[in-house]
Swiss-Prot record:
Belongs to the protein kinase superfamily. Ser/Thr protein kinase family. GCN2 subfamily. The gene is EIF2AK1. One of its GO terms (molecular function) is protein serine/threonine kinase activity. This is Eukaryotic translation initiation factor 2-alpha kinase 1. ATP binds at L176, G177, K178, G179, G180, Y181, G182, R183, V184, K199.
Amino acid sequence: MLGGSAGTRGGEAEGDGAGAVGAVAPPPAIDFPAEVSDPKYDESDVPAELQVLKEPLQQPAFPFAVANQLLLVSLLEHLSHVHEPNPLRSRQVFKLLCQTFIKMGLLSSFTCSDEFSSLRLHHNRAITHLMRSARERVRQDPCADNSHIQKIRSREVALEAQTSRYLNEFEELSILGKGGYGRVYKVRNKLDGQYYAIKKILIKGATKTDCMKVLREVKVLAGLQHPNIVGYHTAWIEHVHVHVQADRVPIQLPSLEVLSDQEEDRDQYGVKNDASSSSSIIFAEFSPEKEKSSDECAVESQNNKLVNYTTNLVVRDTGEFESSTERQENGSIVERQLLFGHNSDVEEDFTSAEESSEEDLSALRHTEVQYHLMLHIQMQLCELSLWDWIAERNRRSRECVDESACPYVMVSVATKIFQELVEGVFYIHNMGIVHRDLKPRNIFLHGPDQQVKIGDFGLACADIIQKNAARTSRNGERAPTHTSRVGTCLYASPEQLEGSEYDAKSDMYSVGVILLELFQPFGTEMERAEVLTGVRAGRIPDSLSKRCPAQAKYVQLLTRRNASQRPSALQLLQSELFQNSAHVNLTLQMKIIEQEREIEELKKQLSLLSQARGVRSDRRDGELPA
């Protein structure tokens, strides 16, 4: 038998080792009987839970899940409030419980941080509501049928509205755009009546490191205060529940035939269905490269408005249908039906002989409700982008004959826009931040004077998205991924497209392409795509070189393949591009900074002198006779 033979071999090995050394092992203090293999019993009629264990019981491995740990922390905080009404002592009890669970290895200190206090508040409200509903149900009639389950589910949307800051405080008006890492919505604050832009980023499968990186970068963005940077107001995190099918099996439905590959790759929340995305942060919508591959990597339509409507019909286990809509490019309404697997907590009969057979049902993968984090970033509303301005300039340039009669083509206007852009880039580079996705769509013109505002910073956690995002197409071939190539094709530097390391000089390449587009009107989109693509090979339009030689020179310098040879934002501000006006402004800014430092130093010296004088006066008062 295996157990006996293994023990015999082990004894022979020990004996050989002892003989080689020449030492005799001392007799054991307690002589235990030799272990033999367990006798075999006929357990065919014994329930599985009562059968004899033949191996040590393996403890289940609990994978680190931020959402689960946040819920556990919220439960601890809720219990602390229930058992200790005093707010101060309740807070102390909560901290003590967290420390205890951290020592036991059940929690991470990260999930107990104050950054998630608002999220825990939402959990506590939901827990309170759930307890009240359960208590009312038990008090009414505990022996009734399961019809109350449908009532509880019908309250899910209302409960989400009660615990959502976004739904409570803001009225969503329209969608402004789809970025690489989320969607931006135009909203109105219900309290002050002002309009804002809120970017919603769906975080899927977040780990501790990922969440810390997101929070750290949000804090960095909050510290950016500059006239040429989109104003940042606040940020918060909420829980959202998304119905995701683990491994979707293609079902032959007529409604699925009209769906494109791009639409079929995401569900109603824009969550990717690729299996490799489970171990990394996944943001709503597709990656920038996949999103822009059909427009900005080739030819981009000026009137390109991505609006889709798709109807998702979700079969609930009670037989009800839940519908959600999303617009499609051609404006048509399409339907997609997903059959949800049964919930283990609720007994149900989920068979239908008319619509599908048992074999079809067994082929479907179970669908689970996953809870993800949604990051909300409230920003200043800027509706006019530089892309819109350039498109209008190109249209008017075809109509205007005299440049003086067409301010959109005037060099002075383009120079003013480019100067403010470079000043904003100089500021963020001075703060140690690389934008990584500078393009006309991410640059805005605000107010009547059309002040330049740089926005839509590509979060560095986008690198986390791309680590394991090796998507696979339908036919099994590897789909193009972005990896570390963050940016849009026409404006991204060569090192970004090659996936190598990049720094602030990568932003300067994008600045060079934007400089060319500001001073070179295009008649067609094909012409624009050809010219901007030719810049990579060092080809500058002859018309630009003749009309604006200084701008053409710096376009050539900024788009060099060697990143170290590109001028910095500071060098641009000190160049002849702005006829020394930028240099004067920069000098004044540096003087103001120096003066502020001197003022701070003088304040410190004055405070020290006042303290010294106070000590001297006290000593003198002590020496005076009574």
